[in-house]
Amino acid sequence: MEFRPKAATLAPFIDTLKVGDGMGHLNLTLVPLRGEAPGRLDYTLAADAIAAGVLTVTEVSEGGSVPHLAVANEATKMVLFLDGEELVGAKQNRILNTSVLVAPKSRTKIPVSCVEQGRWRYASPDFQAGGHSPSGLRARKSRDVGRTLRATGRAVSDQGAVWDEVAAVHAALGSHSPTMAMHEAIDQCRDSLDGYLKALPYPQGARGVCVSISGAFAAIDLFDRPETLERIWSRLMTGYALDALVALNRKDLPPAPRGVLHVLE
């Protein structure tokens, strides 16, 4: 089932938030968000479930289908896939179109987008957890997914726009991939990305973070508990840092007026 909380259910969740002290490195600024969440869901993260061998993600058939993957959850608790989370392997790498909670002991399909335009052949029988999408790609994808959700009830992206975003990342960073894989941009910039990760460790107790890049608002990510954010911090940060590197390399980007403090007011 897809996890799409309504505004009414989010209000008490947001009301408890407290804004922490900002921290930054080069052109990336993070403001931690702390506070208690009402209630707790019993779930495990998809990456952990895959590593534990209780969750399998495959193509929906031998022939495959670009916008969907098959999930078999053998765990006794729900499994959470995160919006923008990357899955690598099978016929081509994908990212989640939206956050999804998969019921215990169940099988389902999840909505995804391709982030490896030049491959449609098996590299492995199933998928492993990868990195996390940069916030620019997530924002573009989310706008398109939101439109199709309202119009059709289905979480479908504009696949061409996703490929354009991945190509723009490679162009800005000077990275190269024969299959135009987003993952290759991350691998080829690993030293620079690690500089951001080392300078910006997980802020203890935070269950959310507000992000700005080069002075412009980029993203807010918020979770029901600090443990979830801490667990995915390095992958989430890699996505933010990739956007920050793109901004450093693209001198033509105009400054945006909406910074972190403006958004949090």
Where is each model-derived feature located?
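Intrinsically disordered, low-complexity Pro/Gly/Ser/Thr-rich segments with frequent PxxP/GP/PP motifs
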Residues: 3, 7-12, 16-25, 29, ...
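Edge strands and adjacent loops of beta-rich recognition modules
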Residues: 32-57
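Short, solvent-exposed loop/turn segments enriched in Ser/Thr/Gly
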Residues: 62-68
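An exposed acidic His-Trp-rich patch
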Residues: 91-115, 233-264
